[in-house]
Design a protein with these regions (language model features):
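Glycine/serine-rich phosphate-binding loop and adjoining beta1-alpha1 elements at the start
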Residues: 1-35
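Short, glycine-/Ser/Thr-/acidic-enriched flexible segments
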Residues: 47, 71-72, 107-108, 134-135, ...
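Rossmann-like NAD(P)-binding element
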Residues: 81-114, 122-130, 134-135
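Conserved active-site and cofactor/substrate-binding residues in soluble primary-metabolism enzymes
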Residues: 15, 19, 43, 69-72, ...
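Conserved, well-folded catalytic cores of nucleic-acid-processing
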Residues: 3, 59, 80, 101-108, ...
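Adenosine-phosphate binding glycine-rich loop
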Residues: 118-128, 132-196
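Short amphipathic alpha-helical segments
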Residues: 53-54, 78-79, 113-117, 140-143
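Glycine-rich phosphate/diphosphate-binding loop of Rossmann-like nucleotide-binding domains
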Residues: 25, 29-100
């Protein structure tokens, strides 16, 4: 336990997200600051949507809204998160008030595009959208309205970079473990305990 604490304190081995869900949360915090009191809309309540929604729910959000084509699935996830389910055909109402939109559906076409956003009364200059769907859920033309849009490839790059950084820290962690083990062996010799 002591050695683990020393490794965590003296290295960056546990810094940076390596999962797509955590990378999405980190990216949101980087662009929006503290997520406390932010409003989030999660579109898609499948595996990836759940993963990101659960990571976001830990951030003391003002509100988390969950939309899914199958409404009862949205209700289940929203209940798990103390959030609010959204009917899929009412997305427009929630898009215009969200600070962050995460989209992770299995749709074969765009769910959100510039035309759909223009039909709402929203101001999208401060809106962050993260599209983790494959194929894409959000058309890049939303950026013409001032939306900051990131996709799953951006998140993979973040996760891959963090994985590389962690691997660099492994050597330092091994040195600390070897050093601590040597100190332990020496202390056992001093008190007369046989070699380990």
């Amino acid at each position: 336990i002591h050695v683990g604490r020393v490794v965590r304190n003296k290295t960056n081995i546990n810094k940076g997200s390596i999962s797509i869900g955590s990378a999405a949360v980190d990216l949101a915090e980087k662009h929006l600051g503290n997520l406390e009191n932010k409003s989030v809309l999660v579109i898609g309540a499948g595996k990836m949507g759940k993963l990101v929604a659960k990571a976001l729910a830990e951030k003391n959000l003002n509100a988390i809204f969950v939309a899914n084509r199958t409404y009862y699935v949205a209700v289940e996830l929203a209940n798990d998160l103390n959030g609010h389910p959204v009917l899929f055909n009412e997305l427009g109402k929630y898009v215009q008030t969200a600070d962050l939109i995460i989209s992770a559906t299995g749709a074969p076409h765009y769910i959100l595009n510039k035309e759909r956003l223009e039909k709402t009364d929203g101001d999208f200059k401060d809106l962050l959208m993260i599209d983790i769907a494959n194929p894409r859920d959000i058309c890049e033309d939303v950026c013409e309205l001032g939306v900051k849009l990131f996709n799953i490839d951006d998140l993979r790059e973040i996760a891959d970079e963090n994985t590389k950084l962690r691997k660099k820290e492994f050597a330092e962690a091994e040195n600390i473990i070897d050093e601590e083990f040597s100190l332990l062996k020496e202390s056992f010799k001093l008190i007369g305990v046989e070699d380990i």
